[in-house]
Design a protein with these regions (language model features):
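Peptidoglycan-targeting cell-wall enzymes and recognition modules
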Residues: 45-103
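Basic/polar, cationic surfaces and motifs that engage anionic cell-wall
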Residues: 1-20, 83-181
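Structural preference for beta-strand elements that scaffold enzyme active sites
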Residues: 25, 72-74, 127-129
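Residue-level marker of positions within ordered structural domains that often coincide
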Residues: 33, 49, 80, 113, ...
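N-terminal catalytic cores of peptidoglycan-degrading enzymes
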Residues: 1-69
Length: 181
């Protein structure tokens, strides 16, 4: 789907989020699967070439982030089959043979900017979190059991836990371009 199509879907779904007492939260994942496969646990999947796929209507509650699904939008990059991370100093990371592509990363940032604009929420780490960041807050992330470390890094040699900040920075950049700043 095109970015314009995605924005229309967001506009249509926005009223359904008014029933929740808190502002929408957006959780950013990878599928831990292969390129060109989408999963119904996420509202939006982004393929290796940057294609946006609606895999679950935004009006439905996803099954993507433990205890954080109600009133949320779940987005996943289709990648990272076989990815591994080992706690150490520094962490040992291998994003597998299908790591996040540049096209996926840039499309995700553009999707984040669109959500921010249409839902009128800031691009910050309260409203846009990687699954690694959310899992750390809930005790099952990289700093504890390391069950979920989605997008802790975007490239094998990135600084550990830099993925969320990188994505938010890119999303702000795309938002400023759209606003003509």
């Amino acid at each position: 789907m095109t970015m314009d199509d995605f924005k229309e879907i967001l506009k249509e779904a926005r009223p359904s989020f008014y029933q929740y007492p808190q502002p929408v939260r957006v959780y950013l994942h990878w599928t831990a699967g292969h390129y060109y496969t989408s999963f119904p646990e996420y509202h939006i999947c982004i393929d290796a070439d940057g294609e946006i796929i609606e895999s679950l209507p935004l009006t439905e509650i996803p099954q993507a982030t433990w205890h954080r699904n109600t009133g949320s939008i779940a987005i996943a990059l289709c990648c990272c089959a076989g990815a591994t991370a080992y706690k150490g100093d520094p962490y040992e990371v291998d994003l597998g043979e299908e790591p996040p592509t540049d096209a996926q990363i840039e499309t995700l940032a553009q999707v984040m900017a669109a959500i921010s604009d249409i839902f009128d929420i800031p691009i910050d780490n309260e409203h846009f979190l990687t699954h690694a960041e959310a899992a750390d807050q809930d005790g099952y992330g990289p700093e504890t059991t390391c069950e979920r470390w989605d997008l802790a890094v975007l490239k094998n040699d990135d600084e550990w836990m830099s993925g969320g900040d990188t994505l938010r920075g890119k999303a702000i950049f795309y938002q400023q371009i759209a606003w003509g700043l």
